[in-house]
């Protein structure tokens, strides 16, 4: 779920102030609470440098999620569900790169959540929402109380608690995608899977070669509803079991106390705890006896391979020769995963004045813990025993004891921690023609750790086809920073900043930043910024870690023309086969470095009208990434290729053959790719941000108009150092990036009423592909260009409306309806499971949220 599209735009390089009326806060919180379709959220408005944006709470770091993404091997994303939303006063967003004060690793900027200060009173709120189809339901209850007046009582205590719940949504429930003919769009409503509850049998292509890829007649036990023909096999719709949104609930509390010890010394303590629980259901386990079977590795790197075959004489083998099976273990039930994420945070701070300095020092401890309990993966020792002793009947009735032995629960844990001590100070230095020069400086000592432990049985390799992720690492970072603000002329102000970081596991880094603002006219200010950033590799990329995943790939060796396999190959060489991938750490990685530039102006002809425009550019080099499994396979025989290695089946019976039927060594099906993180090429991104605001009086009320837009001029990506740059803006080659995104909002406030209407726009991107015959990439289904009517993902426009009312004493009523026209997400042929791109679109259609807040003031 894209935070900025679903939940409204954030502030620019300034602050979003919390509205003074309770209704504004209720609406902001309601919007934020809609952003929980995924348990782990990352925030990004510009290019997808998702893991390069720094998230802060009250100006200090938040521990990242205790999760290593098995698809990327990376482990530095943030779970924003752990932040107590009802206690938030405003959100600061710094978009111009790294910050000397906050951190040089914020290549893509900073998001800073600021808690309420000196709050007095109490309020309780309830909210709920759903779509028109009454799915994607969510409910929230929150309460906030504050007592003590700093000015009078010299103390203040803030208490905040919140509970959130959402219902699960089956994959086929929402009518989520345009052109919603599921049989043609990703085959979501069709019996396309031959992994069925009744086994489908396959014989060897050549007796004794161990390659089971010749289909046999459909089992007569197959129900009529699942039978396509006498030879097409028993079928299933794999989407029957999948959820597009998991069920979840979250509860959290925060306590913040502030006390003035004297006129020059103040103490603050914060304590927060949040628990988020997700329950996810997926398809029952399956096994495939065709191809190379299931391949996986244990923690030590030992390879396992299981091919689902039945010998002659097995009661479920009706043939006089060995057979391979494609089978869905439906009697084991759906796969169930429960994830519990706990986030704890303790902060103790002192602020005061000393020797002409405003001084602040603090100790921070931030921790996230993840416990995952899951089943739905076959227990290898029990599976081998069940096949050998015939205790499991394929397509028959099985005992509870056998089912339990095949499908035990497993548990994995993860933990990340950040602890730091810092000292900051600021003061005015001397007089300049434009005012007083001011200096801010400080030091920070920080320790980071990341640990992931998989279930011991999983580490040993005792679950069929499941990846084992293990991480254990820590490091310290010591930093010095300073920032000087110098109004050198009455209409010219400069800012100079520098930060020095020393990593225990990496080199030191010094990153400067420079800013200039020139007030050319009373109504016009021109500004420019230059900054550098430094991001050391994450702990999962360099430490004693091992991350495994699975990828679907085609094989250019066995299917060089992309459509017809060579002799000895099979159809999956062309259409795609699932292979294992192993990510190994790279201790020689160099840090990423970036430079950012921005130039813009602020034009304010009156106090009611303003126009801001910024041209920005980010250049990132030494980018840490890995080649995809497909890229590794495509370059298997490229001299000097360092992207990874390919491991193929070594059984000569699986090799390609010559015209005379002689096996060709080294041409077996791909089983595994071994990949490492590398310092690859460079990314250069350039765009324009626009912000137009105007307000005026009308009918005794006030109208506010606001338009925000980001235009991506270029997204140049260089895969390897010295290689060619490819522009990914507006196409699908790199990250499926639209060129234009924006909103236009009109709001009207009068008396107790406040309402708004907002227009949202997300541009499309093309799918032109010169490597295919049609010239247009259409995914892996039977779509035709004529059916879609264009070679692109369409642009998406939606309209939101909202209103709030404060006319009832102490009550605030608010309602928001998003996508009032019920426009479905545009179809994306590259998203073969969802059918839409979750980075920019959502499956909600028209959806509403209502809230009631009662204030005890």
Where are the language model's segments positioned?
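Extracytoplasmic beta-strand/coil segments of soluble accessory domains associated
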Residues: 2-65, 102
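N-terminal periplasmic accessory domains that precede
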Residues: 3-11, 79-81, 105-126, 141
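Non-catalytic regulatory/gating segments with a bias toward low-complexity or hydrophobic composition
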Residues: 7, 91, 111-113, 124, ...
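Short acidic/polar hinge/loop motifs at secondary-structure boundaries
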Residues: 44, 60-95
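C-terminal beta-signal and adjacent terminal beta-strands/loops
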Residues: 66, 610, 713-714, 759-776, ...
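Surface-exposed, low-complexity loop segments enriched in small/polar and acidic residues
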Residues: 70, 167, 175-184, 211-248, ...
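Short loop/turn motifs that connect adjacent beta-strands in outer-membrane beta-barrel proteins
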Residues: 83, 118-121, 150-155, 261-265, ...
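C-terminal beta-barrel architecture of Gram-negative outer-membrane proteins
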Residues: 144, 549, 705-806
């Amino acid at each position: 779920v894209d935070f900025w599209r679903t939940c409204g735009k954030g502030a620019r390089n300034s602050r979003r102030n919390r509205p003074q009326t309770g209704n504004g806060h209720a609406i902001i919180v309601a919007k934020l609470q809609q952003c929980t379709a995924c348990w782990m959220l990352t925030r990004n408005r510009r290019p997808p440098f998702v893991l390069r944006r720094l998230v802060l709470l009250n100006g200090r770091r938040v521990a990242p999620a205790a999760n290593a993404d098995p698809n990327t091997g990376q482990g530095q994303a943030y779970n924003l569900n752990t932040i107590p939303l009802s206690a938030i006063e405003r959100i600061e967003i710094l978009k111009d790169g790294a910050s000397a004060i906050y951190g040089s690793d914020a290549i893509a900027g900073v998001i800073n959540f600021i808690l309420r200060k000196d709050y007095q009173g109490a309020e309780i709120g309830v909210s709920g929402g759903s779509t028109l189809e009454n799915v994607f339901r969510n409910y929230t209850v929150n309460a906030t109380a504050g007592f003590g007046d700093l000015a009078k009582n010299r103390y203040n205590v803030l208490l905040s608690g919140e509970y959130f719940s959402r219902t699960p949504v089956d994959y086929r429930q929402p009518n989520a995608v345009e052109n919603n003919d599921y049989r043609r769009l990703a085959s979501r409503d069709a019996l396309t899977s031959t992994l069925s509850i009744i086994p489908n049998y396959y014989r060897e292509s050549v007796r004794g070669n161990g390659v089971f890829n010749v289909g046999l007649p459909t089992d007569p036990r197959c129900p009529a509803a699942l039978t396509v023909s006498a030879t097409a096999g028993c079928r299933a719709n794999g989407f029957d079991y999948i959820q597009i949104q998991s069920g979840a609930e979250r509860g959290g509390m925060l306590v913040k106390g502030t006390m003035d010890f004297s006129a020059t010394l103040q103490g603050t303590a914060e304590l927060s705890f949040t628990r988020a629980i997700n329950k996810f259901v997926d398809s029952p386990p399956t096994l495939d006896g065709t191809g190379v079977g299931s391949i996986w590795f244990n923690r030590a790197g030992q390879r396992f391979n299981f091919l689902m075959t039945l010998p002659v004489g097995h009661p479920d083998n009706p043939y006089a020769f060995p057979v391979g099976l494609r089978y869905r273990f439906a009697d084991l039930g759906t796969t169930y995963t429960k994830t519990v994420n706990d986030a704890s945070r303790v902060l103790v701070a002192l602020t005061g004045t000393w020797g002409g300095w405003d001084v602040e020092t603090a100790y921070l401890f931030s921790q996230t813990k993840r416990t995952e309990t899951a089943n739905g993966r076959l227990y290898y020792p029990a599976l081998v025993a069940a096949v050998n002793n015939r205790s499991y009947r394929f397509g028959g009735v099985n005992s509870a004891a056998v089912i339990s032995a095949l499908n035990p629960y497993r548990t994995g844990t993860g933990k990340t921690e950040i602890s730091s001590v810092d000292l900051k100070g600021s003061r005015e230095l001397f007089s300049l023609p434009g005012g007083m020069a001011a200096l801010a400086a400080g030091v920070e000592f920080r320790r980071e750790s990341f640990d992931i432990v998989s279930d011991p049985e999983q580490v040993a390799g005792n679950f069929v086809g499941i990846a084992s992720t293990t991480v254990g690492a820590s490091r310290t970072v010591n930093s010095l920073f300073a920032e000087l603000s110098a109004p050198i002329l009455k209409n010219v102000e400069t800012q100079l900043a520098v930060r020095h970081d020393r990593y225990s596991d990496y080199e030191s880094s010094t990153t400067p930043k420079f800013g200039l603002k020139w007030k050319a006219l009373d109504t016009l200010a021109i500004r420019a910024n230059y900054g550098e950033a430094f991001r050391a590799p994450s702990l999962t990329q360099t430490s004693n870690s091992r991350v495994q995943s699975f990828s679907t790939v085609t094989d250019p060796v066995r299917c060089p023309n992309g459509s017809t396999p060579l002799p000895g190959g099979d159809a999956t060489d062309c259409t795609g086969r699932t292979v294992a991938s192993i990510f190994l750490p790279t201790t020689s990685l160099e840090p990423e470095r970036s430079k950012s530039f921005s130039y813009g102006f602020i034009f304010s002809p009156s106090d009611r009208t303003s126009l801001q425009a910024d041209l920005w550019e980010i250049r990132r080099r030494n980018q840490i990434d890995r080649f995809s499994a497909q890229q590794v396979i495509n370059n298997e025989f490229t001299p000097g290729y360092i992207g990874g290695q390919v491991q193929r089946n070594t059984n000569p019976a699986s090799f390609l053959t010559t015209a005379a039927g002689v096996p060709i060594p080294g041409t077996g099906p791909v089983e595994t790719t071994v990949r490492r993180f590398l310092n690859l090429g460079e990314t250069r991104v350039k765009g324009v941000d626009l912000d137009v605001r105007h307000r005026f009086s009308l009918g005794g009320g006030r109208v506010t108009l606001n338009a925000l837009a980001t235009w991506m001029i270029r997204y140049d990506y260089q895969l390897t150092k010295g290689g060619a740059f490819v522009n990914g803006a507006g196409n699908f080659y790199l990250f499926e990036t639209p060129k234009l995104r924006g909103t236009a909002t009109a709001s009207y406030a009068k008396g107790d009423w406040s309402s708004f209407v907002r227009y949202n726009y997300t541009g499309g991107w093309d799918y032109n592909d010169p490597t295919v015959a049609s010239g247009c990439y259409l995914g892996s289904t039977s779509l035709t260009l004529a059916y879609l009517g264009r070679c692109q993902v369409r642009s998406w426009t939606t309209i939101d409306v909202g209103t709030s009312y404060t006319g009832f004493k102490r009550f605030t009523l608010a309602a928001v309806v998003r996508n009032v026209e019920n426009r479905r997400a545009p179809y994306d042929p590259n998203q073969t499971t969802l059918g839409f791109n979750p980075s920019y679109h959502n499956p909600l259609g028209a959806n509403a949220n209502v809230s009631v807040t009662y204030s005890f003031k």
